[in-house]
């Protein structure tokens, strides 16, 4: 089965669901219009299909190699990366003053969905560079911006994020890497970092590492962390490359999936480094990079799910087994069995919902930066903050579920590596873990995003959902009316659960209900956005016989309403159960000796 970039679906989601065209009214994106969007998606899809996708299987089977103290990339990866960088794809949304194209982040994110779908392991390299660009643009000095940003934007150099240490995973307060002043305004880094994605490779001239470390006398815990820039090769004042820095990979991990992406242990042996931002502000500064990465990881969940779905659908159309319950035909296509079609519909509905959630988050990010006035920017900022943990966690959970369902559609053949279905599942499984586990995303949502300011964001969201419900009702379309009823019921349930959690912020009861609440809110967001798509598609119903794709958008939204939104009461019950039996379930009750 040949993977195809979902250009049409992305175009529809951008234009009709998240309404990216409204960004043109801000005046912040000169030259951005419908034609530009279509051209970028078409060209990005072609690059993904023709250059990146053919290397996906080799990346899994061969994988990155560690030889003689350095990482060697999968054959063909370097050439493909150069095609990506030379085409200007690395700088789609970067500022023009640094060599970027200044396009909306939402459009760049759509392109990255196609990149990740074509080759998730390779796509991780430029993905992390995007985060480094964000961090330096926001927190770097003028000199750092001048020296590093043009080459990161062009893709000549790549970037990484160095947080994790053997004793400090999600608990970054425990990190031990030290930064010693060397007397001339720079620093020497000493320590070990693990799980560093694309920490070393042979695809670019230099690698810019953003590293969390502690200065002498820094406060204990997370308040004493600073961010530093340490390049693989030192950079002279004129931008030319100098000698190798005192840092190197000591090994790469053998992983369940994304074999083509080297996951390195990095050793810093008094490596030369520069402070980025203020001392002891490193964790806050790194969150600029992490938030960008979290949204990208959410899109990875969408991307790998889309690829798995396409293969499962192709298999279900070709494979014949048993008698159809609908037509009586024997042998019948797998697609003609109700439960197989149910699985495929659930996959499709969740993919479209997750895609819309991620793109809506990116549009909010664009408006937070470029809104016409302070009030508009603040409203968008609150929405971005509310949506980001949901985009990351809900979409990657969906990615794992969908790749598992895709394997199930294949039956026993899905469990055989040769079909490729297993790779999708293995690759998808990391996404709920890295860039902040999904449990941490849920805690962030409940602990930080339901406060006084962000409580406003939830109310604003529910008001928008309510407006969509009214449009569905006024359509006088029975299918849209049915969606409205499910959406209204789910909205009421979410409001009740939100009120319950808000009254218990900071309590263990709220933390115990965090993960089901994120699922509940994500389901509502997905159902709302699909309903917006259904409203847009309804305008084309006269053409549905000629092009059933439009009717399909309504069918997907209706299926989501009946099969996902309908679960709201049960999920809400789990949210509001609080600690319950958890407090009485100690190690012994769990079977520990």
Task: Describe each region flagged by the PLM.
Residues 1-24, 267-269, 274-279, 311, ...:
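Acidic, low-complexity proline/glycine-rich segments
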Residues 1-123, 147, 573-593:
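Amphipathic, small/basic residue-rich leader segments at the start of a protein or domain
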Residues 4-5, 188, 258, 382-462, ...:
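Alpha-helix capping/hinge segments and adjacent helical runs
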Residues 28-31, 61-74, 285-296, 310-348, ...:
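Glycine-rich cofactor-pocket loops
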Residues 128-129, 140-181, 362-381, 388, ...:
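Internal maturation/activation junctions in enzymes
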Residues 186, 190-244:
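A short core secondary-structure module
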Residues 195-197, 233-250, 255, 262-293, ...:
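A glycine-rich, basic-preceded beta-loop-alpha segment at the flavin cofactor/substrate interface
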Residues 452, 468-593:
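C-terminal amphipathic alpha-helical interaction region
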